C-alpha cells in the first residue's frame, strides 16, 4: 500500500473527483493504506480503478466489476495485472487463489450479498485478509437533508429524504456492525478490527457538496473528466477551505457514531485442499470477461 497521510489523499482526490467523492474516498484511502494486503490481491468491485491506483504502490493481481465501461477504464490505470467483467456472486477464480481481497464501498450495492461473501471467502486462502468498507444505519440519519427536518419537528420528512438518498445511491444494505459481524462469521471470516469513519458533521458537508459539485456532472458528460482545473485546490479559496475540512473529517475517529464502517477480516483456517494457482479460472467466466 502507499504510505501517506490523509492530506495527500485529499489533494489527490480533489484534483480528479467531485468534493463528495473526495471526502469519502480520501478517508477510505487513509484507512486502506494502513493495512498490509499480501499478494496475490483481488479487488472486488474495482470500478474504474481510480481507488486501487490511489492506494496501491504494487500491482493488484486481479479486479472484477459488472460494468464493462468501468472495467475498460480500470485497464488504463496500469495498476491491475488483470481485470474482468464478472459478478461478485460468481467469481471466476480458483479456490484459495488469493492471499488478500479488498472491496471498497461495494457490498452495500449488491443484492445477492450472501453469495458474494461466500465467493470472497472461497477464493481467499486460510489466514488471508479481507478488507472492506460499508455504510452504517447512520448514513441516512446523518445527512443534512434528514437532520434539518427533524430539528424543525418534521421527522417523517427527514426519514423520507434519507430513504430517497439511499435509493439514488443504490444502497441495499446499510447495516450495523453486529449484522456485518454475523454475516462475515457465517462464511468463515472473522472480524479482527473495525473503525467508524465520517461523523455527523462530515455527512452534512457530504450532503451539501453534492449540490456544490453539480457542475462536475456536466463536465464529466462533455469532456469525460470530473475536474477541468485540477490546481483549483491550491488557488481557489473555497477549494482550499474544503481541503482543510476534508483532512479534518478524514482523520477524525467518531467511533460507533459514524456513517461508515471500515472492516478488517481474517479467513479462519480449515482443513482444505492446497491453494489454487492465482487467477486460475475455476469455472467459465461470463462471455464478456476479459483478463
Stretches with model-predicted labels:
Residues 1-90, 100-102, 117, 254-262:
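Conserved N-terminal segment of class I S-adenosyl-L-methionine
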Residues 110-111, 124-126:
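Helix-to-beta-strand junctions that scaffold the AdoMet/dcAdoMet cofactor pocket
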Amino acid at each position: 500500500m502507499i504510505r501517506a497521510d490523509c492530506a495527500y489523499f485529499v489533494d489527490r482526490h480533489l484534483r480528479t473527483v467531485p468534493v463528495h467523492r473526495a471526502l469519502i474516498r480520501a478517508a477510505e484511502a487513509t484507512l486502506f493504506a494502513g493495512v498490509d494486503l499480501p499478494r496475490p490481491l483481488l479487488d472486488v468491485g474495482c470500478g474504474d480503478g481510480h481507488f486501487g491506483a490511489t492506494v496501491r504502490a504494487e500491482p493488484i493481481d486481479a479486479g472484477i466489476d459488472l460494468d464493462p465501461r468501468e472495467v475498460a477504464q480500470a485497464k488504463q490505470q496500469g495498476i491491475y495485472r488483470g481485470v474482468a467483467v464478472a459478478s461478485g456472486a460468481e467469481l471466476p477464480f480458483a479456490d484459495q487463489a488469493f492471499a488478500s481481497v479488498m472491496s471498497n464501498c461495494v457490498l452495500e450495492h449488491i443484492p445477492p450479498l450472501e453469495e458474494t461473501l461466500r465467493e470472497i471467502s472461497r477464493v481467499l486462502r486460510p489466514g488471508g485478509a479481507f478488507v472492506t468498507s460499508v455504510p452504517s444505519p447512520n448514513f441516512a440519519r446523518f445527512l443534512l437533508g434528514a437532520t434539518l427536518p427533524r430539528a424543525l419537528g418534521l421527522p417523517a420528512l427527514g426519514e423520507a429524504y434519507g430513504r430517497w438518498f439511499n435509493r439514488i445511491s443504490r444502497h441495499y444494505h446499510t447495516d450495523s456492525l453486529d449484522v456485518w459481524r454475523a454475516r462475515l462469521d457465517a462464511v468463515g471470516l472473522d472480524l479482527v478490527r473495525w473503525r467508524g469513519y465520517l461523523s455527523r458533521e462530515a455527512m452534512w458537508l457530504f450532503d451539501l457538496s453534492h449540490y456544490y459539485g453539480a457542475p462536475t456532472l456536466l463536465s464529466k458528460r462533455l469532456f469525460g473528466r470530473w475536474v477541468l482545473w485540477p490546481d483549483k485546490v491550491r488557488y481557489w479559496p473555497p477549494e482550499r477551505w474544503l481541503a482543510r475540512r476534508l483532512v479534518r473529517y478524514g482523520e477524525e475517529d467518531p467511533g460507533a457514531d459514524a456513517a461508515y464502517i471500515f472492516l478488517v477480516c481474517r479467513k479462519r483456517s480449515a482443513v482444505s485442499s492446497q491453494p489454487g494457482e492465482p487467477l486460475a479460472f475455476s469455472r467459465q467466466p461470463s462471455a464478456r470477461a476479459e483478463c
